[in-house]
């Protein structure tokens, strides 16, 4: 029979996981408390938190969310979870940049919007621009042809108006001179 404290801890982890739109799993073996504090300070402004977890409890919590996914591989050895509550790509970029300077921080993998990613895929995803940039690029690529179409449709009408205006001014000059 599980202890009430463990049941409560699993429930707390489960609630954190439910509220996050991405979970990044890392190994932190060998990093000092000061290093972890520095890492937490880098990702806190990005609306993310970095927490060391007990593997058995975290695995129970995550299996409630994703019972059909094989996630045991992420919970071998010392494990910390980064909970991303906003755009995960900015947090990924910050984690990868931090790992360049602190080689002891190793990626195990992650879950972003319900999809499981390996450590290598997580590093590749970190190279993507933030969601807002991608969306603005998509909107720009959609609106550019539309603007061009509108201009091309307006051009003959504008040309006709300018021509008629020029003819009217010319006739006005002729009638004044007579």
UniProtKB/Swiss-Prot annotation:
Query: Quick one: a GO cellular component term?
Result: cytosolic large ribosomal subunit
| Keywords, in A-Z order | Ribonucleoprotein, Ribosomal protein, RNA-binding, rRNA-binding
> Biological process GO terms, please?
translation
A Pfam family this chain is assigned to: Ribosomal_L10
One annotated GO molecular function: structural constituent of ribosome
Sequence similarity: Belongs to the universal ribosomal protein uL10 family.
How does this polypeptide assemble, per the annotation?
Answer: Part of the ribosomal stalk of the 50S ribosomal subunit. The N-terminus interacts with L11 and the large rRNA to form the base of the stalk. The C-terminus forms an elongated spine to which L12 dimers bind in a sequential fashion forming a multimeric L10(L12)X complex.
Role: Forms part of the ribosomal stalk, playing a central role in the interaction of the ribosome with GTP-bound translation factors.
UniProt name for this protein: Large ribosomal subunit protein uL10
Native source species: Dictyoglomus turgidum (strain DSM 6724 / Z-1310)
């Amino acid at each position: 029979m599980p202890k009430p404290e463990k049941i409560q801890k699993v429930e707390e982890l489960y609630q954190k996981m439910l509220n996050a739109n991405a979970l990044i799993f890392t190994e932190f073996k060998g990093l000092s408390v000061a290093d972890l504090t520095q890492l937490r300070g880098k990702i806190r402004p990005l609306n993310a938190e970095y927490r060391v977890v007990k593997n058995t409890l975290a695995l129970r919590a995550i299996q409630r969310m994703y019972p059909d996914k094989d996630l045991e591989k992420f919970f071998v050895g010392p494990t910390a979870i980064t909970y991303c509550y906003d755009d995960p790509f900015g947090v990924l970029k910050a984690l990868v940049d931090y790992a360049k300077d602190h080689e002891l921080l190793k990626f195990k993998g992650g879950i972003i919007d319900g999809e499981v990613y390996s450590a290598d895929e997580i590093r590749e995803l970190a190279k993507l621009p933030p969601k807002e940039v991608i969306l603005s690029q998509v909107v720009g690529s959609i609106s550019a042809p539309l603007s061009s179409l509108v201009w091309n449709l307006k051009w003959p009408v504008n040309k006709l108006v300018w021509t008629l205006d020029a003819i009217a001014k010319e006739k006005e000059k002729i009638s004044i001179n007579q």
